[in-house]
A protein has these predicted regions:
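PLP-dependent aminotransferase-like
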Residues: 1-20
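Short glycine-rich anion-binding loops that position phosphate/pyrophosphate groups of nucleotides
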Residues: 8-12, 74, 209
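Active-site pre-lysine segment of PLP-dependent enzymes
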Residues: 16-36, 43-75
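A generic "structured core" feature
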Residues: 37, 97, 114, 144, ...
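Conserved core segment of the aminotransferase class I/II
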Residues: 62, 68-132
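Conserved PLP-binding active-site segment of the aspartate aminotransferase-like
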Residues: 87, 164-170, 186-226
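Conserved glycine-rich beta-strand-loop-beta hairpin in the small C-terminal domain of fold type I
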Residues: 115, 133-142, 152-166, 173-179
Length: 231
């Protein structure tokens, strides 16, 4: 069987969410061709000002064709090293053997602690709290960009923990990144993710950016990009 890997909740780096209609088409293809869809719920925990979209795994007819992959790395901490898989029944034993043979299993104490954290409602409380925090940081970044970079476009603002700032084609994002590094601002160039023709832009993570620092950070961005590129 063939397989396709997707991140429908929040594609990295552009931040797009896969529409329900396209999810349904993908499932129909998987059923018709007896293929698998590997659904990585990357950044699926965080969304802002938009309604949730159904996981592919939860849609009708998905149980035999979708392998759902989730992780606690964004919601709790990457150091916890906990992830989970919801797979078709016919694959579960094979997956268990493969994971155990490679040592890719969670120790019992960590698993039990996380199970209790979920069952007690503490995870839901934590999720709500950190979502409010990230929403405020996102709003501060977007507002600062509107003030200081009014001619650029921000993509991927609906979900996740980063946005993409599109740059004009004649602005080299690698040069902008270098200038930002000199003033202590770390961002990633969008062109580094391109397979063919580079798209100019910056990948901006706001998870660790307090609201009080967003304006200064975006002013540094504007200075590194240069006024000629923004008019």
């Amino acid at each position: 069987a063939r397989a396709v890997y997707v991140t429908p909740s929040h594609q990295y780096p552009l931040g797009a969410r896969m529409p329900v209609t396209r999810r349904a088409l993908l499932l129909d293809w998987a059923r018709r061709t007896d293929s698998l869809v590997l659904e990585d719920d990357y950044d699926g925990e965080f969304r802002y000002d938009v309604s949730p979209l159904p996981a592919l795994r939860s849609m009708p007819g998905a149980a035999d064709h979708v392998v759902y992959i989730g992780t606690a790395s964004k919601l709790i901490a990457p150091s916890l090293r906990v992830a989970w898989i919801a797979a078709p029944r016919r694959l579960r034993e094979r997956l268990r053997v493969e994971l155990e043979s490679r040592g890719l299993v969670v120790n019992e104490a960590t698993g039990l602690a996380l199970a209790e954290f979920i069952a007690s409602g503490s995870l839901a409380t934590h999720h709500a709290r950190v979502t409010r925090t990230y929403a405020a940081r996102r709003a501060a970044l977007v507002a600062a960009a509107s003030d200081h970079l009014p001619f650029v476009v921000l993509d991927g603002v609906e979900a996740g923990l980063h946005v993409v700032l599109r740059l004009p084609d004649d602005v080299d994002d690698l040069d902008v990144v270098t200038r930002l590094e000199q003033v202590g601002v770390a961002v990633s160039p969008l062109s580094a993710y391109a397979v063919a023709t580079p798209v100019r832009g910056l990948v901006l993570c706001y998870a660790g950016l307090p609201e009080t620092q967003a304006d200064a950070a975006v002013r540094a961005l504007a200075g590194a990009i240069g006024p000629d590129a923004l008019t």
